[in-house]
Amino acid sequence: MYRIIAADLDGTLLSPENKITKYTEKIIKFLIEKGFYFVFASGRHYIDIMKIRDTLNIKVFMITSNGAQVYDLNNVLIFENHLDEEIALKLCKMKYLDADIITQVYRNNQWYINNNKIDNNFCPTLSSLRYKYFCPDVFNFKKVSKVFFTSHNLKKLHTLQKDIISFLGNRVNVHFSVPGCLEVVSGEVSKGYGLKLISNILGISLKECITFGDGMNDQDMLSISGKACIMENADSSLKKNLPYAEVIGSNKNDGVAVFLNKNFIKNNKFIKCF
């Protein structure tokens, strides 16, 4: 039986409106009451994930910034690993002046965006943080958890991904969370590493973990768990890379909650009442 439930947020647990629906909320709370451990695993900043958790008034583990930080049930930081300062600087200079690509940084509790851009349609609606402008020549690159690039020009982002891998190799992990967002963290961290850490702390085997995701940054987490579930709306490359994973409903239709209800709490009177 699975005891740890780990889920990505955007495109997975969250609705297309970037909310936890009432139905999903009730399923999560019911399972936590029954002794299951929940893990929110996301590329989002810690502050964003914390606010989602606090809105639900629950205790969950949190894997933030694609594994750069991991928090326990009591909101204690139990792991962090930042990008090397030199690497973060190089990343931020790669496309800083490209008019089609927005360079963005998570450092400590702040979100930064390159100062030659005004239109940033990708992130303000997804985040409770408000960005500040930065210039890499005078920026302090200590404790940068993630550098990410957003663009409507997907061809440029795919070329950038190849360039980063060629230039930095395994010193970084670089993945698309969604087609228009390329994310880079330290090569020593990932959602999968965060899940391993949590399973070790709890003394629960990874075989007793079930995972849910939709993006390429979810692949390593999905690949190490006892059961992997991919959203109907997931990246086609993810489905191709993990052919054994079960494809479930879309986030538009509460896919995760519907699956959990059917497979974990079927015929329970509490669930039947809503």
Curated annotation (Swiss-Prot):
CDD domains assigned to the protein according to its UniProt record, in alphabetical order: HAD_Pase (cd07516)
UniProt: phosphate binding residues: L9, S42, G43, K191, N217
Keywords: Hydrolase, Magnesium, Metal-binding
GO-annotated molecular function: magnesium ion binding; phosphatase activity
Catalytic residues (positions): D8
Listed EC numbers: 3.1.3.-
Residues where Mg(2+) binds: D8, D10, D214
Signal peptide: none
Protein family per UniProt: Belongs to the HAD-like hydrolase superfamily. Cof family.
Name recorded for this polypeptide: Putative phosphatase BUsg_029
